[in-house]
């Protein structure tokens, strides 16, 4: 009753038995076999389309395939009759298939899409793809005149808006020549406590500022600050900056009648407070000026009551402490005439309690005259020229900047001798031993003992180096050198201990005194007796180098700075990043080698027995450190 369904598996079995092994023919349903038997053109077109990928087939192969098709159709003849009803249902699908085949035959060769054309299209599309390279930039517009200058000179262009006044190291005068500008008692205090000759920065300041300051103060005591303007001073360390700003303060304020805060001197550290206080105390002898200092060792409440009862004329203070007193209203700023920033670069880098904003907020609220220039701001630093952008918050009025007559950033004292020790990388292990040998070679003169300040990079390095030097001296690795003052100072010890160590170092009567320090000693410590500075670890910038070396060759005395440079890397860093920023006097010293080649080879020559002793000292320190940790 019903026709048998078409079974493709039977057709596949019959096809596989008759298939030639050379050509593999896919299984085709019966309806397609019937069409292939009755329609030779359709079969030819179908064969042509099925063999499209094999263009090298011959006509003989085509005949063989057609004969095989006929054999396959004959083998499935009984099944064909049973599938006629099924074929009728799929006639529409078969018609569409035949139409597709006929359309493919009618296509022209140019319309057919081949794999070669696809590759060609891909090649064309890739022509506009660029590699990941930077976008071309327009050429820079440069000033041809600047090409003739050294690149380091460009750093000095930040002060174009200020009135620049240059000075050189030869500007030295007798203090007696300022007899008409300075009070007689003040002049006597200067010559008896300090010097009879001025330093260059003092000379230029007294020549340019004192006459204007005196005349403006006589004309109008309330508004003289606006006529004078603000003063910015770029001077090397140890050039007499403290005396340079202290003398004008005492000269103007000596005749005041009522105690009011008229001058505030901001310093970055408590150690500097004592130095400035000593200077002003000596200058103000014989006057009624009240010079006070505020420091953390004192109770804030006691200082508050003290300032309320007896207001100072000149106050020396750190930024954080100043904010505390302003918030407690220990004093007001109505009568403030001078604001001095000593070591300004470090002050401007500090943000303790936002001291800058708090100070100028109170200054604006307390002052009746709120126009610019109501306070003379005196900014002093050895590295001032790098901080032009930070001075914006000081609200400068008609500023005058005093610069050394040099295109370099920083100036080195004329009598400072710089010596470089180029240590090979292979000898870096014995760097502490080489340091001890260099200290041993330093000779003390008959006039003064050798006081050596050694700078290291960290607190741990300071402690470790001191212990190792003590161990080497105790082992007799260097003869006749055990009897010397040797200590270290760092931020891990208390302020009282630090001050005591500094006093012991300064007053030591031994022929050699060595103090190992971090950069805490690099600023503002006024010890004129330091003969040598050794940079055991190279500073990170030319600015830090200037402050370190400024501990010696102070007050026009001789000084020596020895730099230990390990390997070519540190030697290159010193020459390219430190030395290029430094200006030296033509008549002064220039950097040179510590020793000639023959003596330098003797310095680096270390015997095996000495190596064993040195390594034994290191092992001893390691053992003691492990024992302390337990």
From Swiss-Prot:
Reactions catalysed: ATP + H2O = ADP + phosphate + H(+)
Positions with a binding annotation for ATP: 235-242
Amino acid composition bias (Acidic residues), ranges on this chain: 37-68
Gene: DBP6
Subcellular location as annotated: Nucleus, Nucleolus
Enzyme class: hydrolase
Protein name: ATP-dependent RNA helicase DBP6
InterPro entries: DEAD/DEAH_box_helicase_dom, Helicase_ATP-bd, Helicase_C-like, P-loop_NTPase, RNA-helicase_DEAD-box_CS
Region of interest called Disordered, as start-end residue ranges on this chain: 1-91
Regions of compositional bias (Polar residues) in chain numbering: 78-91
Keywords for this protein: ATP-binding, Helicase, Hydrolase, Nucleotide-binding, Nucleus, Ribosome biogenesis, RNA-binding, rRNA processing
């Amino acid at each position: 009753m019903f026709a048998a369904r078409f079974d493709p598996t039977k057709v596949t079995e019959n096809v596989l038995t008759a298939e030639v092994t050379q050509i593999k023919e896919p299984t085709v349903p019966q309806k397609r076999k019937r069409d292939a038997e009755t329609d030779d053109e359709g079969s030819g077109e179908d064969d042509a389309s099925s063999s499209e990928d094999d263009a090298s087939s011959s006509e003989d192969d085509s005949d063989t395939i057609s004969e095989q098709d006929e054999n396959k159709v004959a083998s499935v003849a009984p099944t064909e009759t049973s599938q006629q009803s099924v074929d009728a249902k799929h006639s529409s699908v078969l018609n569409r298939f035949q139409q597709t085949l006929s359309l493919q035959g009618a296509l022209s060769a140019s319309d057919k899409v081949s794999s070669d054309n696809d590759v060609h299209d891909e090649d064309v599309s890739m022509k506009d793809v660029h590699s990941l390279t930077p976008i071309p930039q327009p050429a820079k517009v440069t000033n041809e005149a600047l090409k003739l200058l050294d690149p380091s000179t460009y750093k000095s262009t930040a002060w174009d808006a200020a009135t620049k006044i240059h000075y050189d190291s030869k500007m030295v005068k007798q203090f007696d020549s300022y007899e008409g500008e300075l009070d007689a008692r003040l002049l006597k205090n200067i010559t008896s406590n300090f010097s009879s000759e001025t330093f260059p920065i003092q000379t230029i300041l007294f020549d340019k500022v004192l006459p204007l300051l005196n005349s403006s103060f006589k004309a109008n005591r309330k508004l003289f600050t606006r006529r004078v303007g603000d003063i910015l001073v770029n001077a090397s360390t140890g050039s007499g900056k403290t005396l340079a700003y202290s003398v004008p303060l005492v000269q103007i304020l000596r005749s005041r009648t009522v105690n009011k805060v008229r001058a505030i001197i901001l310093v970055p550290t408590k150690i500097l407070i004592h130095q400035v206080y000593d200077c002003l105390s000596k200058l103000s002898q014989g006057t009624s000026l009240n010079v006070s200092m505020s420091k953390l060792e004192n109770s804030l409440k006691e200082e508050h009551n003290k300032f309320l009862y007896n207001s100072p004329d000149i106050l020396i203070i750190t930024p954080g402490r100043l904010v505390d007193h302003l918030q407690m209203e220990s004093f007001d700023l109505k009568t403030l005439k001078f604001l001095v920033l000593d070591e300004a670069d470090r002050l401007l880098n500090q943000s303790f309690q936002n001291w800058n904003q708090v100070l100028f907020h109170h200054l604006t609220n307390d002052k009746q005259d709120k126009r610019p220039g109501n306070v003379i701001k005196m900014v002093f630093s050895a590295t001032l020229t790098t901080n032009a952008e930070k001075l914006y918050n000081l609200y400068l009025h008609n500023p005058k900047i005093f610069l050394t007559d040099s295109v370099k950033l920083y100036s080195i004292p004329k009598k400072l001798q710089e010596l470089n020790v180029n240590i090979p990388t292979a000898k870096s292990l014995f760097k502490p031993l080489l340091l001890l040998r260099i200290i041993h070679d330093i000779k003390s003169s008959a006039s003064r003992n050798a006081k050596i300040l050694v700078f290291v990079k960290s607190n741990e390095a300071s402690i470790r180096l001191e212990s190792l030097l003590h161990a080497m001296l105790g082992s007799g690795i260097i003869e006749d050198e055990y009897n010397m003052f040797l200590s270290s100072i760092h931020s891990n010890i208390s302020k009282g201990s630090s001050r005591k160590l500094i006093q012991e170092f300064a007053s030591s009567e031994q022929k050699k005194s060595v103090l190992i320090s971090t950069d805490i000693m690099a600023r503002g410590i006024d010890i004129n007796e330091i003969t040598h500075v050794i940079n055991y670890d190279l500073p990170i910038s030319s600015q830090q180098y200037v402050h370190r070396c400024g501990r010696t060759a102070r007050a026009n005395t001789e000084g020596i700075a020895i730099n230990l440079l390990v390997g070519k890397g540190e030697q290159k860093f010193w020459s390219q990043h430190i030395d290029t920023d430094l200006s030296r006097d033509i008549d002064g010293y220039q950097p040179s080698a510590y020793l000639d080649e023959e003596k330098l080879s003797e310095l680096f020559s270390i015997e095996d027995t000495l190596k064993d002793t040195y390594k034994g000292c290191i092992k001893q320190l390691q053992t003691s450190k492990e024992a302390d940790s337990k």
